[in-house]
């Protein structure tokens, strides 16, 4: 009987300990993991003279190779800027525009447009200069991997609203984590565009409400939509990303409270979306960029024509296997062992109870037979014989 009790106790202890391990798994720490701190680096990509407004609408264009800010690293935050030589910001309020800058990684093939692009598009910015923060303010351990031999390529458009040329410095601010970076998940950038794989420009309409819808892109893998960076132009009032026709990201572009150098308000921030849900093979992703130029004035060229507009979402997707169902998002690979051990423990426990009850029932019968030959010898026996 004592042996039976020990066996039951052992099984119950194992079941309880395994149950605790399953629910505390997300809190367990690997002592071999190294806590990684983000490093920061500001990079200057040259000083350029931007022509006056009456020359090609004040546009300056640049395409060139540039070095990455780090190698064998994970980039977590990216932002671009335009400055004067004294370090002050050159923006719409003082008549200078970072019209566009787009970074390509020439070491990787673009996942949507392939060879139609010079590399994988992983970061873009307009004059709103919204940072691409893959950590979502430090909430996520997410980054973009840069290999040892990766090379960047940039495509830049600067615009001058003044009628005299302006000298400006093109810069970018990077945050990154160097090896080892095992704490970070790696995102793959996917560029969704209303213009598909052509130029991102699409025609604007004055004093009208209109929208552009991108062709759906069908995915062929499992993953998580970890971060969505959105880009539109002046006149936009709504930007939506859909998966299989259902909205998974909806943002309202924000405008400055003060007029720019041209006397109208301009975009100041286009919010991103994070943790927009899972994707699976066969899912289709598209976006809709909605404009209202009756409320927000579009950009106008020097000859009175409208500048084209855009609708872009750069989505970082963490690729992986099919999701496993769980009741709280934790790791439940202990569920089957728990169920098996619990079943065994309950079976043994029930057997022990049945065995004890039977012994207690049979004891008085045996004792009465014993009394024919000798008297009751212990207090327990005397009690059971009553």
UniProtKB/Swiss-Prot annotation:
Residues 1-22 form the signal peptide. Its EC number is 1.-.-.-. One of its GO terms (molecular function) is oxidoreductase activity. Coiled coil: none annotated. It is a single-pass membrane protein. Glycans are attached at residue 86. One of its GO terms (cellular component) is membrane. It comes from the Eukaryota. It is an enzyme of class 1 (oxidoreductase). Pathway: Secondary metabolite biosynthesis. It is found in: Membrane. Keywords: Copper, Glycoprotein, Membrane, Oxidoreductase, Signal, Transmembrane, Transmembrane helix. The chain crosses the membrane at residues 334-354. Its main location: membrane. Probable copper-dependent oxygenase; part of the gene cluster that mediates the biosynthesis of squalestatin S1 (SQS1, also known as zaragozic acid A), a heavily oxidized fungal polyketide that offers potent cholesterol lowering activity by targeting squalene synthase (SS). SQS1 is composed of a 2,8-dioxobicyclic[3.2.1]octane-3,4,5-tricarboxyclic acid core that is connected to two lipophilic polyketide arms. Belongs to the clz3 oxygenase family. This is Probable copper-dependent oxygenase M1. It comes from Phoma sp. (strain ATCC 20986 / MF5453). The gene is M1.
């Amino acid at each position: 009987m004592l042996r039976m009790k020990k066996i039951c106790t052992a099984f119950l202890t194992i079941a309880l300990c395994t149950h605790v391990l399953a629910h505390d798994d997300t809190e367990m720490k690997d002592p071999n993991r190294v806590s990684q701190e983000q490093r920061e680096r500001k990079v200057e990509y040259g000083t350029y003279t931007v022509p006056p407004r009456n020359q090609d609408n004040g546009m300056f264009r640049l395409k060139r190779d540039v070095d990455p800010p780090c190698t064998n690293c994970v980039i977590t935050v990216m932002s671009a800027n335009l400055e004067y030589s004294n370090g002050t910001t050159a923006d719409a309020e003082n008549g200078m525009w970072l019209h566009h800058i787009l970074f390509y990684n020439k070491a990787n093939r673009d996942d949507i447009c392939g060879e139609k692009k010079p590399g994988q598009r992983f970061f873009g910015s307009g004059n709103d200069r919204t940072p691409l923060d893959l950590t979502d303010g430090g909430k996520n351990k997410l980054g973009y991997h840069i290999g040892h031999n990766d090379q960047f390529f940039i495509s830049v458009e600067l615009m001058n609203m003044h009628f005299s040329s302006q000298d400006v410095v093109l810069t970018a601010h990077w945050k990154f984590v160097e090896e080892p970076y095992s704490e970070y998940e790696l995102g793959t950038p996917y560029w969704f565009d209303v213009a598909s794989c052509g130029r991102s420009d699409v025609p604007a309409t004055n004093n009208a409400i209109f929208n552009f819808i991108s062709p759906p892109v069908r995915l062929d893998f499992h993953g998580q939509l970890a971060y969505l960076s959105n880009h539109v132009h002046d006149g936009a009032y709504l930007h939506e990303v859909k998966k299989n026709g259902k909205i998974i990201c909806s943002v309202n572009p924000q405008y400055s409270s003060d007029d720019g150098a041209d006397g109208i308000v301009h975009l100041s921030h286009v919010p991103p979306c994070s943790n927009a849900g899972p994707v699976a093979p066969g899912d289709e992703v598209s976006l809709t960029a909605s404009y209202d130029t009756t409320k927000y004035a579009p950009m106008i060229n020097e000859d009175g024509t409208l500048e084209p507009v855009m609708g872009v979402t750069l989505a970082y997707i963490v690729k992986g296997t099919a999701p496993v169902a769980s009741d709280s998002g934790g790791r439940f690979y202990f569920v089957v062992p728990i169920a098996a051990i619990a079943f065994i423990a309950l079976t043994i426990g029930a057997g022990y109870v049945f065995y004890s009850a039977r012994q207690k029932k049979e004891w008085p019968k045996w004792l009465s037979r014993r009394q024919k030959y000798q008297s009751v010898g212990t207090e327990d026996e005397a009690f059971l014989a009553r």
